[in-house]
From Swiss-Prot:
It is found in: Cytoplasm. InterPro entries: Chorismate_II_sf, Chorismate_mutase_AroQ_euk, CM_AroQ_sf_eucaryotic, CM_II_prokaryot. Keywords: Allosteric enzyme, Amino-acid biosynthesis, Aromatic amino acid biosynthesis, Cytoplasm, Isomerase, Phenylalanine biosynthesis, Tyrosine biosynthesis. Disruption phenotype: RNAi-mediated knockdown decreases chorismate mutase activity. RNAi-mediated knockdown decreases cell population growth rate. RNAi-mediated knockdown decreases antifungal activity against Fusarium oxysporum and Botrytis cinerea. This is Chorismate mutase. Catalyzes the Claisen rearrangement of chorismate to prephenate. Acts at the first branch point in the aromatic amino acid pathway where it steers biosynthesis towards phenylalanine and tyrosine, and away from tryptophan. Induction: Induced by aromatic amino acids and chorismate. Pfam families: CM_2 (PF01817). It comes from Trichoderma parareesei (Filamentous fungus). It comes from the Eukaryota.
Amino acid sequence: MDSAVDMADSERALNLTHIRFQLIRLEDTITFHLIERVQFPYNKTIYTPGAISIPDSKLSFFDWYFFQQEKLQSLIRRFESPDEYPYFPEAVQKPILKPLNYPKILHNNTVCVNDKIKKFYIEKFLPKVCPDFGREDRGEAQENYGSTSTCDIACLQALSRRIHFGKFVAESKFQSDPEYYTKLIQAEDREAIGESITNAAVEKQVLDRLRLKVETYGKDPSLLEGVEQPIKINVDAVVSMYKDFVIPLTKEVEVEYLMQRLIPEE
């Protein structure tokens, strides 16, 4: 919810140096949230509708909690920020705080990939990184369902912010060469647009930096150097998530945003 990019200054918000700084900070945020999450087992029960009885709701425990959390957060303006996208838009309420007057930064668009993020995170990623304690789920009386869900929400919102930041990159690229991108958009050449915003060297730097961070943050710094210790999270799984999911999905967001860039705004 915090932002190193000043959304009150449209020029600064679209400065690639400042965007890059924010993306690097989000690597830290995501890494720490994931390390917190893997203290707990997968706890599949919380994602299964009907597995936990909730009065007047057919949602899973996790979705119910997430809905309520975003409802509360909307009251304090979280989703007024141009870089925040709710997983449950129907939960968003009118803020109790006076509105912040953000300038126009992004072109109007409908690009939101939160459903893809949540599905991948719950169904693909968590089973790879959550610890196996060698026992069955012991149920709501003994498992940390609330703490697990709280960690999940933090992870998912940070991932959403990281991935949707691609819109700011795309808008910055468009403004740097509108004639070039207009031709590609009019030709509906998604492949060429994707190639124009891809930098393999930068992607490698991101993955190398992320690996170092996960390895570093996943250890106890108080132990003597050279002392063997287990790392708190599966480093390869986190790096793979970025390589095979976060980076490609960010690129998809960038391309689809640009495909809507020429649509007249009302």
